[in-house]
Swiss-Prot record:
One annotated GO molecular function: rRNA binding
Keyword rRNA-binding: yes
A GO cellular-component term linked to this record: ribosome
Classification via PANTHER family: 40S RIBOSOMAL PROTEIN S15A (PTHR11758)
Matching HAMAP family: Ribosomal_uS8_B
Biological processes annotated in GO: translation
Similarity comment: Belongs to the universal ribosomal protein uS8 family.
Source domain of life: Bacteria
Name of this chain's protein: Small ribosomal subunit protein uS8
Assembly with partners or alone: Part of the 30S ribosomal subunit. Contacts proteins S5 and S12.
Length: 132
């Protein structure tokens, strides 16, 4: 069975594991998912990620980050652009998540960037997700 929206599946797995206070979460890997994981790591939402060879395909494993008394680093995740309704933003009209406290992940011609990086480079693109 094919998956209609692998990014939404990734975000749902991370959200569910985060809410259940799991230490790690695994999922099928792709270049796009690995790039999203890299952005989450750069922004401090996860500890680390690894891509491992499985019997069939590759597996992406994220190590979730918690502070002090198991307080979650990720308060929320939201898929913005969906297969049925794509959402694009110009470089002059990029969204800010919670007034700059969160991160918008944007797919641009220069690869996946955060909203701040895209603003600095002056590029727009498809708004994939919000993380706060």
């Amino acid at each position: 069975m094919t998956m209609t929206d692998p990014i939404a599946d990734m975000l749902s797995r991370v959200r569910n594991a985060n809410n259940a206070h799991h230490d790690t979460v695994s999922m099928p890997s792709s270049k796009l998912k690995a790039n999203i994981a890299e952005i989450l790591k750069q922004e401090g939402y996860i500890e680390s990620y690894t891509v491992e060879d499985a019997k069939v395909g590759k597996t992406l494993t994220l190590e979730l980050k918690y502070t002090g008394n198991r307080v979650r680093s990720i308060a929320g995740l939201r898929r913005v652009s969906k297969p049925g309704l794509r959402v694009y933003a110009k470089s002059t009209n990029l969204p800010q998540v919670l007034g700059g406290l969160g991160v918008a992940i944007i797919s641009t011609s220069q690869g996946l960037l955060t909203d701040r990086q895209a603003t600095e480079k002056g590029v727009g693109g498809e708004v994939l997700a919000y993380v706060w």
